[in-house]
Design a protein with these regions (language model features):
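A Zn2+-metalloprotease active-site environment signal
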Residues: 1-176
Length: 177
């Protein structure tokens, strides 16, 4: 990925509000089949179709305005605890966007005669790499793991892999008829 430097080894893809989709080299390397990369790209296209980037900007701005109205001056907020509820609410919105993008990808894959299990396979590989980093963090700070799920912008990977499996069953049942 241009601009991130040669040492970027994070497997990721993301959609910008402009509709551009950026993919890291590491994500491409992790894909064992083209269908796996297609699944991730369809997920990102789901973000573009549903305008998640723009909606996130609007929601973030609205939360800032509400915080200003309640507190008076956001610049004067030095206590992170005052900003935490807004951050948690925003993380919840992000998780909803991720679920919506997943659903878009699964439905498009079925329409294209591709098994949604490819998404689950790829997500498992991506989170396997991320899990190693999280385990390192948990060793350094054992109390951090429980809080991470509340601060995450993505739903838990096991639930997403399970959803891909359910859509895969629908896909395979349709092929048998």
């Amino acid at each position: 990925m241009s601009g991130l430097g040669d040492d970027t080894r994070i497997a990721n893809a993301f959609a910008l509000p402009s509709g551009d989709i950026l993919v890291t080299d590491r994500l491409v390397e992790l894909a064992k089949k083209p269908e796996e990369l297609d699944a991730i790209l369809l997920h990102e296209i789901g973000h573009v179709v549903h305008r998640h980037g723009m909606r996130q900007i609007i929601q973030s701005s609205a939360l800032t305005i509400i915080l200003m109205l309640v507190i008076g001056d956001v610049g004067a907020v030095e206590e992170w605890t005052l900003a935490l509820p807004g951050f948690l609410l925003e993380s919840n919105y992000s998780q909803g966007f991720e679920t919506e993008a997943d659903e878009y990808a699964f439905k498009r894959m079925i329409a294209m005669d591709r098994d949604p299990a490819y998404f689950g396979h790829m997500l498992g590989r991506i989170t396997g790499e991320g899990r190693e980093a999280a385990e390192d963090k948990a060793v350094q700070d054992p109390g951090s793991e429980g809080w991470l799920r509340y601060l995450s912008s993505h739903p838990g990977s096991p639930a997403r892999v399970e959803q891909a499996r359910r859509y895969s069953e629908i896909f395979n049942a349709g092929r048998l008829q």
